[in-house]
Amino acid sequence: MPKVLISDALSNLANEIFEKNNIEVDTITDLSPEGLKKIIENYDGLVVRSATKATDEIISAAKKLKIIGRAGAGVDNIDLISAKKNNVIVMNTPGGNTNATAEHTLSLLMSLYRNITEANRGTHKGLWEKKIFKGLELKGKKLG
């Protein structure tokens, strides 16, 4: 049975998916680079987010490793040259954060448009500056 290490915090759904597909999963999220290097030889797969750095030293120590999955868009925390040299496939999820990014962008735009940050700051100081809090209304306008 293939064995995967999840070394960064992920939803428990990830574990369920692996287990439904007869893949043994260990989730160890507090590993130091040295700790990861010591145990990586026991795994066929490694799942990371951005905290774990899959360096050449770690990848080279992973004699059974076949794949590194990055739960996120970038792969800057994975040594791609080392992965290629060691015949390790690297995959990511480039569209996984699209909705969250769009929602965050719209939230920031609305915050700017309605002066929410300034209003919050003033309220915490005990001020109630109605003119600053008013902001602008969207009715009849296009935003974005």
Go through each PLM region and give its residues.
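An N-terminal-biased, well-structured beta-alpha scaffold segment characteristic
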Residues: M1-M91
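Phosphate-binding beta-alpha-beta segment of Rossmann-like dinucleotide-binding domains, i.e.
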Residues: N86, P94-K142
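Residue in the alpha/beta-hydrolase core beta-strand immediately N-terminal to the catalytic nucleophile
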Residues: G69, K142-G144
